[in-house]
Every structure is written in C-alpha cells, then in structure tokens.
Amino acid sequence: MTNIRKSHPLLKIINHSFIDLPTPSNISSWWNFGSLLGICLILQIATGLFLAMHYTSDTTTAFSSVTHICRDVNYGWLIRYLHANGASMFFICLFIHVGRGMYYGSYMSIETWNMGIILLFTVMATAFMGYVLPWGQMSFWGATVITNLLSAIPYIGTTLVEWIWGGFSVDKATLTRFFAFHFILPFIIVALVMVHLLFLHETGSNNPSGLNSDADKIPFHPYYTIKDILGVLLLLLFLISLVLFTPDLLGDPDNYIPANPLNTPPHIKPEWYFLFAYAILRSIPNKLGGVLALILSILVLALLPHLHTSKLQSLMFRPLTQTLYWILVADLLTLTWIGGQPVEYPFIIIGQLASVLYFAIILIFMPMAGMIEDNMLKMD
C-alpha cells in the first residue's frame, strides 16, 4: 500500500515540498533563512491578529489603544514587542536571504528571483504601513514624508498623494486604509511565497559550489528539517532575548509621543531596515531623482541575472568579485548609518559617495570583475 502522504491529494503537495523534496547534499546554513522567513511570517500573522483584536484605527484612539494593549491586555506587551521586533528579525533574515542569493548566484533562477523581488517590495510596503499604525510622532511624520514622495511624479503626483491620503493631509482616512492594507497584505504575501516556492521547486535549489547537483540529492526530511529546527531555535532565542531585555532598542523614542501635526520631530527617519534606501533617497538633491533612486536601489536586483558575465555561477571560486561583494555589504551598512544621521556635513557627502558606490559596484564593477576572472582563469 502506498504511503498516505504520497497518495492523498493535499498531503502529496506537502510531501513534495517539505518531505521527499530532493535537495543538494551540500547546502550550508545560509540556506536556512528561507524557512526562517516562513517562521517570521507565521509569527507576524499570529501576533498581528491578536493585536488587531484590541487596536482601533482612529486618530483619536489609536495611540491610546496601543498603550491599552501594553498595559491592560494579558501579555499584550509581549505580543506587541514580539510583533515590532519580529519585523526587525524578518528584515534581518530577508537581507541575509537576498545576500546569499547574490553571493551564490541563485539569481540565475530568474522566475524565483523576480518573485523574490516582488515579495521584498510587498514586505517593505506592509512594514511601512505597520509603522504608521501606533500613531506616534514618527508614525505620522514618516507617513507624511514618504507618501509625499509620490507628488514628485509629473502631472498626476499631487492628485495621487491626496487620493492615497483620502484628504488634504495624513488623517483619519489615511490611518484607516493603512490598517486595512496592513491587515490584508500578509495574506497576499503568503500567496506570493507559495508562487516563490513553486518556481523554486521547478528548478531545485542552488548550492554553494554553483554546480549542477542532480547527481547528489538527499531528501529534505529528516536532514534539512533538523537543520532548519536548529536555525528556528536560534532565531527565537535571539528574538525573545531582544523582546525581554531591550524591546525598544530598534525603535524610535519619538514614537512614544502622540502624533502632533503642528510639531515636527527634529529628525524624521524610518525604521532601521529602510535607512539604506532613505540615505540613497536623500543623497539626490532633486525630488523626482531621489524617488527614482529609491525605487532603483531595490529594482537593481532584477538586473543581476542579465549582468552576470562570469562562466562560474557562485562567488565561491571568484576572489575578485568576492572582495567587491563584501565592499558592497560594508557600503550598505554605511548607508544604513548615514540614513539615521542629520542632513549636514559630512554626512551628506558620505551618503552621496556611498550611494554612487552602491550602484557602481552592482552595475559596473561586478560585471567587469566577472570578465576579468574568466580571462585570468582562461575560461574564454
């Protein structure tokens, strides 16, 4: 008799995705972050659902309702901080996941990669709208500044901004619709994740060597389920430590001040995971140019498969491009730091140099290094 997991219509799909999935035998811990992202998503939906039960999306009561959750709801403070810091964990895992894809040339599976970019944009939109909901000073002014960027679009910009706001400023209508979108988007993300996995399982996983691993595959369960459980335990340990010891470490103190349209905070800045893109936006004096650079800072990832010049897929055997890759990582950390600094000398010039370097490495230096390495290895 065939095992039920292999014959049942629903269990069969789960079996082919998580149990009998043929997986390269040599994938390292950098491949753990896909499953960690899944855990983060489940955690965010679960905690978010409980928060939504007590939250009110009205400008007069939103801030108070968050305070009420933390003070009066059983373990409300825990749910709230798990949700807020869970978002940070989500983005840490996302950045590592994308970074691993860049390092090992996983972007050569174009459908999976493009689906990942769409997912990245969707998660960023969800996180941005979630940041607006507590209706603190940084929530209000962050929403005002970021939505206002759309006014840079020629001809329809101003109309578009007022349409998104639901009025002439960020107000009750804006908060209500942001809450609605913030609630629905994670479920759309779940659907997109399924498509992402569908494309991934069409081609199979890449591996550190970048070579074809068809001749050396092992079942996903028990080998990688055990390996993933270790990753999940470490992630939860890190998250729970953050939540219980320093829950406000990654937040902004200004968000503990209720939103006041008459008083602008000294430094308007988004959450830490958007600072690199915010620094790129600020480094261009022109508004439309800044908005385009902001979008391109993520969209440039879609060009990676077309900019791949080397005959080797992975960077494992390419020391020149490896060096450029780690300079790019350092550059992104620099941009993250700059995004949180005031707009004054020397931060402006550092931000501009780091922004130019970011695009130069991806668009010029890495493709050139690939050709040079091929030449040196006599692979032409």
Swiss-Prot record:
Q: Where does heme b b562 bind?
A: H83, H182
How does it sit in the bilayer?
A: Multi-pass membrane protein
Q: Where are the transmembrane segments?
A: 33-53, 77-98, 113-133, 178-198, 226-246, 288-308, 320-340, 347-367
Entry-linked Gene3D superfamilies: Cytochrome Bc1 Complex, Chain C
Tell me one Pfam family matched here: Cytochrome_B
InterPro entries xrefs: Cyt_b/b6_C, Cyt_b/b6_C_sf, Cyt_b/b6_N, Cytb/b6-like_sf, Cytochrome_b, Cytochrome_b_C_euk/bac, Cytochrome_b_N_euk/bac, Di-haem_cyt_TM
Positions that bind a ubiquinone: H201
Which domain of life, per UniProt?
Answer: Eukaryota
Lipid metabolism listed as a keyword:
no
Q: Which GO terms describe its biological process?
A: mitochondrial electron transport, ubiquinol to cytochrome c
Q: What else is known?
A: Heme 1 (or BL or b562) is low-potential and absorbs at about 562 nm, and heme 2 (or BH or b566) is high-potential and absorbs at about 566 nm.
Q: Which PANTHER family match?
A: CYTOCHROME B
Q: What does this protein do?
A: Component of the ubiquinol-cytochrome c reductase complex (complex III or cytochrome b-c1 complex) that is part of the mitochondrial respiratory chain. The b-c1 complex mediates electron transfer from ubiquinol to cytochrome c. Contributes to the generation of a proton gradient across the mitochondrial membrane that is then used for ATP synthesis.
Q: Which family does it belong to?
A: Belongs to the cytochrome b family.
- Entry protein name: Cytochrome b
Which source organism? Eliurus myoxinus (Dormouse tufted-tailed rat)
